[in-house]
UniProtKB/Swiss-Prot annotation:
Keywords annotated in UniProt: ATP-binding, Kinase, Lipid A biosynthesis, Lipid biosynthesis, Lipid metabolism, Nucleotide-binding, Transferase
GO biological process: lipid A biosynthetic process; lipopolysaccharide core region biosynthetic process
A single GO molecular function term of this UniProt record: ATP binding
Protein name, per record: Tetraacyldisaccharide 4'-kinase
Binding site for ATP: T55, A56, G57, G58, N59, G60, K61, T62
Keyword Lipid metabolism assigned: yes
EC number of the protein: 2.7.1.130
InterPro entries registered for this protein in UniProt: LpxK (IPR003758), P-loop_NTPase (IPR027417)
NCBIfam families, alphabetized: lpxK
Involved pathway(s): Glycolipid biosynthesis; lipid IV(A) biosynthesis; lipid IV(A) from (3R)-3-hydroxytetradecanoyl-[acyl-carrier-protein] and UDP-N-acetyl-alpha-D-glucosamine: step 6/6
Cellular component annotations (GO), alphabetically ordered: plasma membrane
Source organism of this protein record: Salmonella paratyphi C (strain RKS4594)
């Protein structure tokens, strides 16, 4: 229903317009207060790059963060990552991730980024506190903030927006009548717009999510996902249909697709109940970090990597590395 309202297919969005006007007024006032100097943002002693969204819902932001961290690491840059840690609840903040940190403490996306990149990761509702925690423990040269485009309390040097190339901005209205956190005109002020799927427009960087080999949660064995049989697909991400479509494109045709809420807590019994005898469970990598501790032999995940095309990605990386002292 939310998807139909935000796309404009359902006329119910009109009923929510008063709330959207209020949301837009408040969010605009917050940004203006920092722009005019009534409120002050904290500036880190190292460059800060924000990777965020203009819309609610999954746009492919986390794969972009991983891509950016890995590309900078390949260039010899020491990178730290901060996040709000949505979906997790730590005993105290800021929380600096370790190999023992769970998704219940830090949230699924920070744990995934930490495991994939090995970069220092810290979470805190106040992102400046997370940055300070990393700087106190690690000699990093740059900070990437996973989400937080609208978190103006943290000053930033580079802003990158990730856009769903198929859904783009829906009906264009602020939450809750539409998907917008800020209006599309905000694109004029960011340093780069990366478009996940669909057709990129002038000035935008095209991106595709490229699936790798399926990985067994228990053994680490790898195989082509099309070789798995009797698949039950599970996706607890911002836009589950994208994952199911990826499986189909890989030649894996699920018998059943189970969409879950983004950042949903997964109980062992609930996940086990999804799979019958002779079936294979295939999930996203983000779900896998939550399920690995209680995984069964027939559970697999399909990792995806961001692939950015054209000359713009290299120019963006050059611009970012030029800020590193």
């Amino acid at each position: 229903m939310i998807a139909r309202i935000w796309s404009g297919e359902s006329p119910l969005w009109r009923l929510l317009l008063p709330l959207s006007w209020l949301y837009g007024l408040v969010s605009g006032a917050i940004r203006l207060s920092y722009k005019l100097g009534f409120k002050r943002a904290w500036r880190a002693p190292v460059p800060v790059v924000v990777v965020g969204n203009l819309t609610a819902g999954g746009n492919g932001k986390t794969p972009v963060v991983i891509w950016l961290v890995e590309k900078l690491q390949q260039r010899g840059v020491r990178v730290g990552v901060v996040s709000r840690g949505y979906g997790g609840k730590a005993a105290a903040y800021p929380l600096l991730l370790t190999p023992e940190t769970t998704t219940a403490e830090a949230g699924d996306e920070p744990v995934l980024i930490y495991q994939r990149t090995g970069a220092p990761v810290a979470v805190a509702p106040e992102r400046a506190a997370a940055v300070k925690a990393i700087l106190a423990a690690h000699n990093v040269q740059i900070i990437i903030t996973d989400d937080g485009l609208q978190h103006y309390r943290l000053a930033r040097d580079i802003e990158i927006v990730v856009i769903d190339g198929v859904r783009r901005f829906g009906n264009g209205w602020w939450l809750p009548a539409g998907p917008m956190r800020e209006r599309a005109s905000r694109l004029k002020t960011v340093d780069a717009a990366i478009v996940n799927g669909g057709v990129a427009r002038a000035g935008e960087i095209p991106m595709q999510l490229a699936p790798g080999l399926a990985v067994n949660l228990r053994t680490g064995a790898r195989c082509d996902v099309a070789q798995l049989s009797n698949i039950v697909a599970m996706a607890g991400i911002g836009h589950p249909p994208r994952f199911f479509a990826t499986l189909e494109a890989c030649g894996a045709h699920p018998q059943k697709c189970v969409p879950l809420a983004d950042h949903q807590t997964l109980a062992p019994a609930d996940v086990q109940a999804l799979v019958g005898e002779g079936q294979t469970l295939v999930m996203t990598e983000k779900d896998a970090v939550k399920c690995r501790a209680f995984a069964e032999d027939n559970w697999w995940f399909l990792p995806v990597d961001a692939r950015l095309s054209g000359e713009q990605p290299d120019k963006l990386l050059e611009h970012i590395t030029s800020l590193v002292r």
